[in-house]
Design a protein with these regions (language model features):
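N-terminal secretory signal peptides and thylakoid transit peptides that target proteins
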Residues: 2-18
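N-terminal active-site segment of His-dependent metallophosphoesterases
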Residues: 28-111, 116
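Extended active-site neighborhood of metal-dependent phosphoesterases/phosphodiesterases
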Residues: 31-49, 112-225, 245-262, 266-268, ...
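Binuclear metal-dependent phosphoesterase catalytic core
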Residues: 31-47, 51, 179-181, 306-309, ...
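Active-site-proximal beta-strand elements of phosphoester/diester hydrolases
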Residues: 54-67, 189-199, 229, 354-360
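Active-site neighborhood of phospho(di)ester-bond hydrolases with catalytic His/Asp-centered motifs
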Residues: 59-61, 92-96, 128-134, 228-230, ...
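Active-site environment of divalent metal-dependent phosphoester hydrolases
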Residues: 66-69, 100-103, 130-142, 200-203, ...
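His/acidic metal-ligating clusters that form di-metal
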Residues: 191-194, 205-344
């Protein structure tokens, strides 16, 4: 069991009831525990709207560092330097799978792989926060670090530029909220929830946020506009209007096939931009493409947790999934994910929640020949803008 996980009943019993006020309450009010067990261990003066009422930040995901040679991949280094020059962000949100493979997640090697990434943030005086993906800590044993140990290295290397948003009581590591305030104010004007979506479920497939994480969100969210960041996308993305059924493929390949038992089954159609991508639904899979109005690229099927995992007691709160909770509370304006390396779409679903995916920031694993990130501009009126930023050989920048 994760040492950061507490009993759900104990957590809920210890949580304080929020007063009916807008915004998030202060860290000290959220939990009846010592200050060391709350959140917000960072310089809030660095995370503020500027004089124009704007706050700019980047989402960086799936870097998949695999070299211990003390330098970043060329494409990642250039991607960050060009993005820093163009957007001048105050913050980078790292949404998991920053390292991978036995080599770079092993003790001694992890530090060598990570430090060049942190160093480029410090060089440009950009703050950063981190949560984890399925690959960061998939190896276990005395030769590999836990998520918590990795988090501590981010904190150690980042120093004053590390935004320690973590709430230690919650399942996983790298869970919490980064508050963005107006200059001269201590009241958050916009919140960034950065959460650990786990790695792999016990019953197969990917994991999802747990009951205590959802309960905590409902307790602290208030009505302040917010964005949500985690590594693994929620399955609701497939069924809430962002995708439409792909045109039916006809001809010989579409004919019904017979199994060895003589049963009729639908043929497996190859996924692609013409045939669609096989999205998981509660009743099976459907070949789908981006709906009209959804911007960006869909280049692979989404990889959320299984519905049976996502809806079970360990991953719901009072019968509500994470998405149900967002709809109930009403403050989440958008939710952004990594995990699916070549997807970079962005669109509003039928319930008014904006969903986006951000592609891999390196060529270390499968990719489409571009390395990318996502740039955000928050506005003091509770709105925001976002766009993707890419580099590709010969590394000329492009954005859309």
């Amino acid at each position: 069991m994760d040492k950061n996980k507490i009993n759900r009943r104990d957590f809920l019993a210890g949580a304080v009831t929020l007063a009916a006020v807008a915004g998030c309450r202060s860290a000290k009010e959220k939990f009846p525990v010592s200050e060391d067990c709350t959140r917000c261990h960072y310089d809030a003066e660095k995370i503020r709207f500027n004089a124009k009422g704007e706050f700019r930040f980047l989402q960086l995901t799936d870097v998949h560092l695999k070299s211990c040679e003390g330098k970043l991949p060329e494409e990642t280094d250039l991607l960050l330097r060009q993005a820093f020059a163009q957007y001048k962000p105050a913050l980078v949100v790292l949404t998991g799978d920053i390292v991978w493979c036995k080599l770079t997640t092993a003790k001694g090697n992890f530090e060598k792989a990570l430090k060049p990434l942190v160093d480029i943030f410090i060089e440009h005086k950009v703050c950063f926060c981190v949560t984890f993906g399925n690959h960061d800590s998939e190896y276990h044993g005395p030769d590999w670090y836990t998520r918590q140990e990795m988090y501590d290295f981010y904190k150690k290397f980042g120093g004053e530029y590390f935004v320690d948003h973590d709430v230690p009581e919650l399942t996983g590591c790298g869970n919490g909220v980064v508050e963005v305030c107006l200059d001269g104010s201590s009241k958050p004007q916009f919140n960034l929830f950065v959460m650990d979506s786990g790695a792999y479920a016990k019953d197969g497939g990917y994991d999802a946020c747990r009951t205590d994480q959802i309960a905590w969100y409902e307790k602290v969210c208030g009505s302040t506009p917010a964005l949500w960041f985690q590594h693994i996308i929620v399955p609701d993305v497939n069924v809430t209007g962002l995708f439409v059924d792909a045109p039916r493929v006809t001809g010989k390949s579409d004919a019904a096939e017979k199994t060895a038992k003589g049963e009729t089954q639908e043929p497996k159609i190859k996924e692609g931009p013409d045939t669609g991508y096989r999205m998981s639904w509660p009743d099976g899979g459907r070949m789908m493409l981006l709906a009209p109005g959804v911007k960006g690229d869909l280049m692979e099927h989404t990889c959320p947790p299984r519905w049976i995992t996502y809806r079970n007691d360990a991953h719901t709160y009072k019968g509500r999934t994470l998405y149900d909770s967002w709809c109930k509370m009403g403050n989440i304006k958008g939710a952004y994910f990594g995990h699916d390396h070549t997807n970079s779409f962005d669109g509003v679903d039928k319930n008014g929640i904006r969903f986006g995916m951000t592609k891999t920031a390196s060529f270390s694993t499968y990719n489409d020949g571009t390395a990318g990130l996502r740039a955000f501009t928050l506005h003091a009126d509770g709105t925001y803008d976002t766009e993707t930023f890419f580099v590709k050989p010969p590394f000329k920048k492009s954005s859309k």
